[in-house]
Each structure stands twice: as structure tokens, then as C-alpha cells.
């Protein structure tokens, strides 16, 4: 669960970063997304070493792999952008609660702060690009 949600959050942020960089040509917002992506990756180390997560990964045996379709159709960069903000925020919540359950309060606080940074980035993005 931790590995899947770390991947989901960093993949979502990569998609956000690329849309902001290549779709909207916005260096400031794409740089903020990049920094947030790196912060999520670093926070993941507070939950479990990356090597341990990789060793425990079982993509072939995952009962949920390939069963669900991705969200609705996306017809514009903006749709892709905000779908990925949801993905990042939801996975951050799962990671935060997993950290609490596993007795890692420092990791939980860090992940909560990252989730709120994702909310702030979404708002800043909407204010700057939402009308385009």
C-alpha cells in the first residue's frame, strides 16, 4: 500500500509538472511541482527504505491491477492537471494515515504538510491558469 501510494503521488506530480512545463510553459509552477515531487520521494524514506518497498512489490499479484479504468475522458491539459492533483492528494492522505497506524508520527506530520502543499499548489495553479 505504501509503495503504490508513493508511486501514485510522485507519478501524479510528474504529470502535473510536465503539463505546467510543456502545456502551459510555466517555469515557476512546474518548478514548485518538481520540488514537491522530490519532497514526497524523500518523505517516503521515513516510511520504509526504497529497497524494501521494491522487494515487497507484487504488481503481478495485485488484485487491483488493471481492474479499474482511469478517470473520465480528458479533453484538455486542464482536465489532466486537476485529475492528477486529486490523485496526489488522495495518495498523500493514505500515506499519512498509514504512517500514523504504523507509529511514525514524524512521517505522518511531514506527509500532512506535503498534502497541504499540494492543496496550495492546486489553488495557485487554478488562480493563475484556471481562466485559460
Language model regions located:
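Structural preference for solvent-exposed beta-strand-turn elements
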Residues: 1-6, 11-132
Amino acid at each position: 500500500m505504501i509503495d503504490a501510494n508513493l508511486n501514485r503521488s510522485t507519478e501524479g506530480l510528474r504529470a502535473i509538472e510536465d503539463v505546467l512545463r510543456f502545456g502551459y510553459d510555466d517555469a515557476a509552477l512546474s518548478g514548485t511541482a518538481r520540488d514537491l515531487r522530490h519532497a514526497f520521494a524523500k518523505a517516503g524514506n521515513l516510511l520504509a527504505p526504497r529497497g524494501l518497498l521494491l522487494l515487497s512489490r507484487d504488481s503481478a499479484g495485485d488484485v487491483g491491477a488493471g481492474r479499474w479504468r482511469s478517470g473520465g475522458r480528458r479533453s484538455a491539459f486542464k482536465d489532466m492537471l486537476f485529475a492528477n492533483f486529486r490523485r496526489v492528494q488522495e495518495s498523500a492522505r493514505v500515506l499519512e494515515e498509514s504512517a500514523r497506524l504504523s507509529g511514525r508520527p514524524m512521517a505522518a506530520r511531514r506527509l500532512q504538510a506535503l498534502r497541504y502543499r499540494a492543496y496550495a499548489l492546486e489553488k495557485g495553479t487554478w488562480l493563475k491558469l484556471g481562466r485559460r
